[in-house]
Amino acid sequence: EFTQYTKRMGRPRGFFSEIIEIGAVKIDGNSLAVTGKIQNFVHPHFYPKQAKEGMDFCMITEKDMESAIEFGEMLEQIKALYVPGQTYFVAWGDEDYQVVAEGCRRHKLENPVLPEDYLDLAAAYKLLKGDTYTTGLKKATEEQNVDTGGLWHTAYDDAANTGKLLVKLLADGWKPEAYWDEAAELHK
């Protein structure tokens, strides 16, 4: 999960949402245990003024940003947890992949995440339930009786809670392949 700044009005020309926080957990597909994590703030380079407003909303302080890492270092941390073709990159919604891809493009760095490894758990949950709307992460964890923690809308806590929901769904017998098969059928 990433925290980024998005604002509809008053954006500079060419504006894109910069990642200002990353949170990730790595879950072993067999044991369903957490085997790694990332929790860092990320320096905004292109739109620091706009990022400041996003930091205020997400309760990120200037002191937090003193320990922030560079975008390229964040990608290296992702590479340490993610093995292309062998690891799913799971997030709640499709925006996380898009914001990483755009950040890579703007920084002129290679995106370490393959699009075919990206799993939008919100879309998968929607299909699993047969809903016509997308459920929010908080409501989905409540529906599945997942014991959540931390603050909502902070990158690491959202990643940890998404991971807990994924583990619950997998433990209940859900398979990610079922999502891709069903999604492919819908797009025929």
Language model: regions and residue ranges:
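Short, glycine/acidic-enriched loop or turn micro-motifs at the edges of active sites
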Residues: 1-4, 123, 161
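Conserved non-catalytic scaffold segment of RNase H-like nuclease domains
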Residues: 1-97, 112, 142-143
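Active-site-proximal helix-loop-helix substrate-binding element of RNase H-like nuclease domains
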Residues: 42-43, 48-58, 62-65, 122-159
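Short, surface-exposed recognition loops or helix-turn segments adjacent to catalytic cores
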Residues: 94, 114-121, 151-159, 179-182
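Substrate-recognition/cap helix-loop segment adjacent to the acidic, metal-dependent catalytic center
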Residues: 95-117
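A structural signal for well-ordered alpha-helical segments within the folded catalytic domains
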Residues: 98, 160-163
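Active-site catalytic microenvironments for nucleophilic, acid-base chemistry
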Residues: 103-107, 127, 143, 165-172
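Acidic two-metal-ion nuclease catalytic site recognized across multiple nuclease folds
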Residues: 165-188
